[in-house]
Swiss-Prot record:
One of its GO terms (molecular function) is magnesium ion binding. Its EC number is 2.7.7.72, 3.1.3.-, 3.1.4.-. The keyword Coiled coil does not apply. InterPro entries: CCA_bact (IPR012006), HD_domain (IPR006674), NT_sf (IPR043519), PolA_pol_head_dom (IPR002646), PolyA_RNA-bd (IPR032828), tRNA_CCA-adding_enzyme (IPR050124). This is Multifunctional CCA protein. Catalyzes the addition and repair of the essential 3'-terminal CCA sequence in tRNAs without using a nucleic acid template. Adds these three nucleotides in the order of C, C, and A to the tRNA nucleotide-73, using CTP and ATP as substrates and producing inorganic pyrophosphate. tRNA 3'-terminal CCA addition is required both for tRNA processing and repair. Also involved in tRNA surveillance by mediating tandem CCA addition to generate a CCACCA at the 3' terminus of unstable tRNAs. While stable tRNAs receive only 3'-terminal CCA, unstable tRNAs are marked with CCACCA and rapidly degraded. The lineage of its organism: Bacteria, Pseudomonadati, Pseudomonadota, Gammaproteobacteria, Lysobacterales.
Length: 416
């Protein structure tokens, strides 16, 4: 029996990146032997064990053979005779098929992963890559993480991914797996690479049709030099990732904010009147299909509905600002206003030539919200107030606080 460090921990160390969890593969053992050493079995589909002291995962070396459709149709063999090289061959990409012998530091790299790391190439290991449709999403997610390091996908891997999309393999992916890969991509610095990769291999229209529909929809060049709404969406996603690193909640809201532009009549192009309202339905549809957490869906709907109002904040009357805060449930969920402000700033800056633009509307919205939030029912003289009068008086007091918070010379955002 011998164990090797494998996968992401080895890859990230070679890239000089912070390593995540350590995963180990065990050669020459069976489940009974692992249990006798105190390892706790946790794997449902294949033998995985937790180390009795460190809690790290140790998986028996295994092979996988396709016997059905989709990503679950595999026969697993974890016999003690399975070699390390056989286990590494079943993995997705060469850069993930590198093992390290921790006793002497030797790298075991039978499929050229070290060279691909040096060349910054994401390459599949074998034709078996095509047997698991989830790997198309994993490739896109890896690009969201690795594109900033200069990585690209090997041409032969792109070709295989296109074929997988064309033959319908991706239709077997369940919503939870799509959401898992999408949400993880939103934690990286270049989530647009996730969308771009899927679009390149014709997979975006299968797994995220609401987003795919944005591509090819023109915007007014005076306000959107990038013109294409899909490209605007990519820019917004990357700006959001910079403004709120690792924040999936803000990332998802930014992803959904302009879905309505795909539904505006062609006769109005490149203008998109009412796209905020039109975007509510596809945002809800996408959220429900992927079984997105409710708080994600709620913020996405708020961003979709309110982003133009925030852009033109300086033109809104005090009572209109108060109504905006109420629609956001901002007095019970105060964190939403800062989140909305970030999404709107990403929208404003997600345009060619505006990536570093100042966005005072966001700070001003937070300032107005803070002024209104500071007023509560205890501050009112309630001697002569009863029932609904208390709520009405509180609303008026908060509107006065908004009015007293000052104004600024901000943009209108009318043409967004």
């Amino acid at each position: 029996m011998k164990s090797y460090l494998v996968g992401g921990a080895v890859r990230d160390a070679l890239l000089g990146q912070p390593a995540g969890d350590c995963d180990w593969v065990v050669v020459g053992a069976d489940p009974a032997h692992m249990k006798s050493l105190g390892f706790k079995p946790v794997g449902r589909d294949f033998p995985v064990f937790l180390h009795p002291k460190t809690g790290e995962e140790f998986a028996l070396a295994r092979t996988e053979r396709k016997n059905g459709h989709g990503y679950r149709g595999f026969i697993v063999n974890a016999d003690p005779t399975v070699t390390l090289e056989q286990d590494l061959q079943r993995r997705d990409f060469t850069i993930n098929a590198i093992a390290r012998d921790q006793t002497n530091g030797t790298l075991i790299d039978p499929y050229g992963g070290v060279n691909d790391l040096e060349q910054r190439v994401l390459r599949h290991i074998s034709p078996a890559f095509a047997e698991d449709p989830l790997r198309v999403l994993r490739a896109a997610r890896f690009m969201a993480r690795l594109a900033p390091l200069g990585f690209s996908i090997a041409p032969e891997t792109l070709a295989m991914m296109r074929q997988m999309a064309a033959n319908g393999e991706l239709n077997s992916l369940i919503p939870e797996r799509i959401w898992k890969e999408l949400s993880r991509s939103l934690t990286y610095t270049q989530p647009a690479a996730f969308l771009h990769t899927l679009r390149t291999v014709n997979a975006l229209e299968v797994v995220l049709p609401e987003l795919n529909a944005l591509y090819g929809v023109p915007q007014h060049a005076d306000y959107h030099p990038e013109i294409d709404t899909g490209l605007h969406q990519e820019l917004v996603s990357d700006i959001a990732a910079k403004l709120a690193p690792g924040d999936m909640l803000i990332g998802f809201a930014a992803l959904c904010h302009d879905l309505g532009k795909a539904l505006t009549p062609r006769a109005t192009w490149p203008h998109h009147p009412m796209h905020e309202q039109r975007g509510m339905a596809p945002t809800q549809q996408l959220s429900e299909r992927l079984k997105v957490p409710r708080n994600y869906q709620q913020l996405a709907l708020i961003a979709c509905r309110e982003h133009l109002n925030v852009h033109r904040l300086s033109k809104l009357h005090d009572n209109t600002v108060y109504e905006l805060l109420q629609r956001c449930d901002a007095f019970r969920r105060p964190e939403r206003i800062a989140q909305l402000a970030i999404v709107c700033e990403a929208d404003y800056r997600g345009r060619y030539g505006h990536e570093d633009a100042n966005y005072p509307q966001g700070q001003h919205l937070c300032r107005l919200h803070a002024a209104a939030l500071a007023i509560n029912a205890r501050d009112l003289n309630r001697q002569d107030l009863h029932g609904t009068q208390i709520g009405e008086a509180l609303a008026q007091a908060r509107i006065r606080a908004i009015s007293s918070a000052g104004v600024y010379d901000g943009g209108t955002g009318t043409n967004f």
